[in-house]
């Protein structure tokens, strides 16, 4: 550490102030900068001891009693409640919209909370200056004003999880305690805080990683780069507030030029002098507003920054050392406070909050006078009051109570809330200036919902019917007006119901209003269940009379099937139980007989297979009477064991009872066929039959067919059929069993009910489940054909189904089988909607067991009146509903006239507070219904103010229910999407992202002239200095932030929104190229954008009160703006689209000038930090960051070399890093090895091949950059310089 003992340190001054945190900081900074670290830390230790000593002696402690709530709080809350009550009254009179009411409520509570905060401070200062809480918060020891406000003021407004502010404030503080409601609202904010912190930590960490990657190779490598450029520093101002003062920006910088006193030209600071506190103070005292200093942005040291351009190392308060890794320090300085930045702020849903507009308060009690020639526009303020906007700058006269004039200056665009000759009180808000900032507004909508049911009446509404391209029409208000809801009880009635009443009828409670009739769609017999919820109609019925079911509900199980026993003794197994649904052709029962049972497995063949195929369905083939089935027996054993375990051989004859494998025996004699797979025996098949040599038999039949044995063996006398097969080369004759199928004679006696639909039938069928030629693998036998009892439907309904019923037989334990078809009719209790459920009554007009015909009436559902009243309106709309409105007694109110002259007539709409007769005023809003001698009867009504441009959702005289949407109000609010706060905004700037909705930028300097506009767009003209005009089309979703006749600079925003930095860079570059050289215009345009980026990042951090030195941001921005994009390579070897360092391409172009070649053209580009990291010279660094495969592949294809200039590359391959002591080590090594002075040699790597360069000279240029950066491959301008360290 450098201790400064070259001069006598100044003696301490006596600071006659209360030493709080701020003063303590100053004291420590003074000690540190004048006496060095050792003494400063000793002094800090002593101050700490002093503090603890006296805190102990004073017994400073915190108690609940120290939380003093200022008594004025009660009055402030009363005043706020009064204001809100007035707002509510205005809303009830229909003088402000729901949005204006919300905005006013929010602003009222915000202002109250702020006033209370000020009162808390004032109260502590005046009454209890030694209060421990006050001492702690205001000395900077612990806590801040916002926490103190929550403890003893009021907690204020909170936001819900969507970020919308809840208009119910927390009026209590933590000292008084919160109510349950307040506690719940309060917990929203707490949860949001936790979630935000968790997200911030991750985002901030990733930001730091990207910053480190982009700046890691920036090291202080030389003392002075000799640059001819500097940057101008002045106060950083935003919204007329100084964010960072010039004084703070100057400390630790190096002067670019000698600075003289404005009065007597004596020197304040010399060129290349670093600015300490004293010099900075003297600069500020002289009134100098801007100073040119050296900056990393303008440093010309290649791939590094020089000592002078960087300035102080802020940790030491002296010039930065050579070899300091300033890139890493910059990255950490920007990344570390990231966690302190908020992610997103709350938005009010209003136009803009008080912070974005500066309020003008009256300096005294008085009156205002407007001049006659005042150019103003009358507007409606965000609170629904009338205000005026000044179109020019004016000095207006305000008079105090003594008549003395004072002139106040108001800027153009100021909104004034008071009219000509209006009186005002001291401290009253008389106007506000909208801060000229990049405040983006967007059109937002809010539903206007009715708080009561009733009839809609339009008054003063100017409506336009707009039809879009799809032909949909929308009603839009051109001018604001009132929507009245005349109160009444509205009933929604379906279109298919009858209304029993007419308009004007007087109605008692429970009068039937409307009836819905339920009609039968079927003939049949009615069946009702106990609850009468569902009516069933029996449409068909069949009963099996000659069979009985043996059935006991208690012991029904799968093993013991239910039997259906016929009178002739035949038994069917029933395959269904009561409650089952039966579809067409479904099996009900299965007949048990052994006529068609085989003894073993085999192959099945049908005689008339072509006929059977027609009868096939999902449940198998229906077998007709006298059909013949052929059966070729074979015994199949599934083995799945190793071949070595088999006890028999393939194609050998075995007798029945032979052991196949252990404990498995064959049941039949025959030839063996073994089916195996990979030494595993899958199956063993035993086929009975006789083998013949094919030469002995002369058969013309094909293998695999059935034929008479005589056709094959002419000598045979047997009359039987065989199946032709082969074993190896030999013919194998297999026996065939034939089954002649006969229909089972099961007699079905059925009984039906008359006059029902004839749908159901019972039928007995034979079915086989096997295909022709199917091989059935089995050892034991199976049934080839089964006899089934099935149900047949004579109906074309595909979804028809029948129910199974077991009907008990009288005086018996047995049952009869019944099949029924029933249709359900559901009674529609919700026909009048869920809202009317309590007023719906249903009555049945049928009985259980009654026979009914199609279109007979089954039930009537009545909607009855909830209250007595008068039927005022019946509305039949096209949307399949009818509505009617009943005016009840509670929907009217009476006002006695006290014999005064009546000032209203029947049908008039009266607002709350309006005069009715003499001094009689309306206690509620309403419509005059009837006027008698002594009183006026009014029907309650509610006026709603609808602003211009609103979309109406209902028509005039329509009937609405409570909570129906009347209109969609369109309003402007500050855009939350684009005022991205905190971390996301920092990321957006540093990644050089294009904003979603960028503002329009002026393409040249000039004067603005606003011209014609229509609904969709506005056209403005920019007249430049040469008189040329440029037209800009502004969409209606963008707002102009400049006024007519205003002068604008190049790339200045014309509309609201964030500028696109890429567009800004292009505008500057295109403008400068027409005036100066390509290199200079690239430098200048980049410098403009650099300044913008630095300021933008600072604004975000300053808004959260985080101080970061400019130089850190400048180091990062330098890396983002160091490259250009080649447009045309000229005679160089550069390719179009290639990204090259600006300095490097300029060196190449200079070399081209010497060889009279065509230089390359290029344009500057702005890279985001991620892109800049990936485009770094070192592929090792880029690959270790992101997209490893792509980076390494491209580097390999291009044959890139990594010069190991940065820290990261050296760390990765395990070398000493070229920073700190490593920097000096490499320097020493370089000094000893450097024996010859390098001469200026052009860079052949980039020049065209026509230029010849000696290899020996080139090899001396391409040295390890860790030795010294002057010999880098593309630093021509420094090649002739001596190393300043030599």
Curated annotation (Swiss-Prot):
One of its GO terms (molecular function) is zinc ion binding. It is found in: Plastid, Chloroplast. Binds 1 Zn(2+) ion per subunit. Keywords: Chloroplast, DNA-directed RNA polymerase, Metal-binding, Nucleotidyltransferase, Plastid, Transcription, Transferase, Zinc. Its cofactor is Zn(2+). Gene3D superfamilies: 1.10.132.30, 1.10.150.390, 1.10.1790.20, 2.40.50.100, RNA polymerase Rpb1, domain 3 (1.10.274.100). Its EC number is 2.7.7.6. It holds the Pfam family RNA_pol_Rpb1_3. It catalyses: RNA(n) + a ribonucleoside 5'-triphosphate = RNA(n+1) + diphosphate. One of its GO terms (cellular component) is mitochondrion. Zn(2+) binds at residues 225, 299, 306, 309. InterPro entries: DNA-dir_RpoC2_beta_pp, DNA-dir_RpoC_beta_prime, RNA_pol_Rpb1_3, RNA_pol_Rpb1_3_sf, RNA_pol_Rpb1_4, RNA_pol_Rpb1_5, Rpb1_funnel_sf. SUPFAM superfamilies: beta and beta-prime subunits of DNA dependent RNA-polymerase. One of its GO terms (biological process) is DNA-templated transcription. DNA-dependent RNA polymerase catalyzes the transcription of DNA into RNA using the four ribonucleoside triphosphates as substrates. Belongs to the RNA polymerase beta' chain family. RpoC2 subfamily. PANTHER family: DNA-DIRECTED RNA POLYMERASE, DNA-DIRECTED RNA POLYMERASE SUBUNIT BETA. In plastids the minimal PEP RNA polymerase catalytic core is composed of four subunits: alpha, beta, beta', and beta''. When a (nuclear-encoded) sigma factor is associated with the core the holoenzyme is formed, which can initiate transcription. This is DNA-directed RNA polymerase subunit beta''.
